[in-house]
Design a protein with these regions (language model features):
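Active-site region of glycoside hydrolase catalytic domains
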Residues: 2-50, 74, 93-95, 103-376
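Glycine-rich, proline-tolerant flexible connector loops at the mouths of alpha/beta enzymes
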Residues: 85-98
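Generic alpha-helix structural propensity
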Residues: 61-68, 76, 85, 101-108, ...
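Active-site mouth loops of central-metabolism enzymes
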Residues: 51-65, 139-142
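A common structural microfeature
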Residues: 14-16, 63, 80
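Catalytic domains of carbohydrate-active enzymes, especially glycoside hydrolases
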Residues: 65-86, 289, 293, 346
């Protein structure tokens, strides 16, 4: 019989041992109590987009079983729970009329989290744009930022007095590049200009949302969560080192530079000027948008070589031989430390949360194996 142990008492006293979810991934009940259609509802129903046409219609049924789920977290000794609010539950059409039953659900959820002694971290957007806003152009359209700010205000007026930690966006890169560049996630579009315009709308939306957070949840700490790339040159060649820095511009500084410096990387104007958005006065304000903390999602590094035949002259290559997860992702724990240090040094970030980290395996329940978790 195999016994595993995890001693959380060894962690610093201000370390929050937590778990995270996203509304569409766990809630189910997609048509319950007035919820509107999201881009993921549509994407999952588009033939060929999702393996075996799986969808989030039921998922973990968290919408109906949230009390049981919170009880399990308490039993595990979890200290913090990061959840997301589903925009289509609050504004079924993205803007206009509010659905009060959606607010009621998250009101009960937050109270339930607090009642069990957990610290709630609320993510305002985890990829589930209301479909009606996508039908009008989606994130590439400037006015979506204004609708997002109104949605954020509505949520914060109801929940803000009980939320110590608030996240504006989860993984801007995935929202923009997977949604509008390579089409691998909802809404499944493929256009570089739309991608960069979506990024600008999202960057502007973060600033507007931070204004609303300061106004309606003044006691909260607020930030953003990014799956920042640790870009490593595949060789020691100077051109590959340049390519690795360029990948950081392409995937990460597109969001980091506006957040902390109020501008976009110069390399993007040099390589793809035709795709870059118009910037109006006040769009990118690093004072108003400055986060209280930075949430980092880290899973694996990316390895890069120069490729002058491409508009952005680089190419991703396979990681060196070594251990991999069941998803084929390389396992490089030291990359987390390296990435944290890079971000600290480049942007003077003082407070981090590791908001996602881990690995996927084809696990099966084992009757001869168990874990003991020692909590503070």
């Amino acid at each position: 019989m195999t016994h595993h142990s995890l001693d959380l008492k060894a962690l610093p006293k201000d370390f929050l041992w937590g778990v995270a979810t996203a509304a569409y991934q766990i809630e189910g009940a997609v048509w319950a109590n007035g919820r509107g259609c999201s881009i993921w509802d549509t994407y999952c129903r588009t033939p060929g987009k999702v393996y075996e046409a799986h969808n989030g219609d039921v998922a973990c049924d968290h919408y109906h079983r949230w009390e049981e789920d919170l009880d399990l977290m308490k039993e595990l000794g979890i200290a913090s729970y990061r959840f997301s609010v589903a925009w289509p539950r609050i504004f079924p059409r993205g803007c206009g009329a509010v659905e009060p039953r959606g607010l009621d659900f998250y009101d009960r959820l937050v109270d339930g989290i607090l009642r069990r002694g957990l610290v709630p971290m609320c993510t305002l957007y985890h990829w589930d744009l209301p479909q009606e806003l996508e039908d009008r152009g989606g994130w590439p359209e400037r006015d979506v930022a204004d609708h997002f700010a109104d949605y954020a205000e509505t949520v914060l007026r109801r929940l803000g007095d009980r939320l110590p930690l608030i996240v504006t966006f989860n993984e801007p890169y995935c929202i923009c590049f997977n949604g509008y560049y390579n089409g691998s996630q909802a809404p499944g579009r493929k256009n570089l200009r739309l991608t960069h315009h979506a990024a600008h709308t999202l960057n502007r939306a973060h600033v507007l949302a931070m204004d609303r957070i300061r106004a309606y949840a003044p006691g909260a700490k607020a930030g953003i969560v990014m799956n920042t790339t640790l870009a490593l040159p595949a060789t020691d060649r100077p051109e590959d080192r340049v390519a690795a820095e360029l990948l950081m511009d392409w995937e990460d500084r597109l969001f980091l530079d506006p957040l902390f410096r109020g501008r976009y990387p110069e390399s993007l104007y040099r390589h793809v000027p035709e795709s870059m958005p118009e910037i109006r006065e006040g769009d990118l304000d690093p004072v108003r948008g400055k986060p209280d903390f930075f949430g980092l999602n880290y899973y694996f590094p990316s390895y890069v070589v120069a490729d002058p035949t491409r508009p952005i002259p680089l190419r991703l290559v396979d990681a060196p031989a070594g251990p991999r997860t069941a998803m084929g992702w390389c396992i490089v724990p030291s990359g987390l430390t390296e990435l944290l240090l890079r971000l600290r040094d480049e942007y003077a970030i003082e407070t981090f949360y590791i908001t996602e980290n881990g690995s996927a395996w084809n696990d099966v329940p084992e009757g001869d194996s168990w874990w003991t978790i020692s909590t503070p």
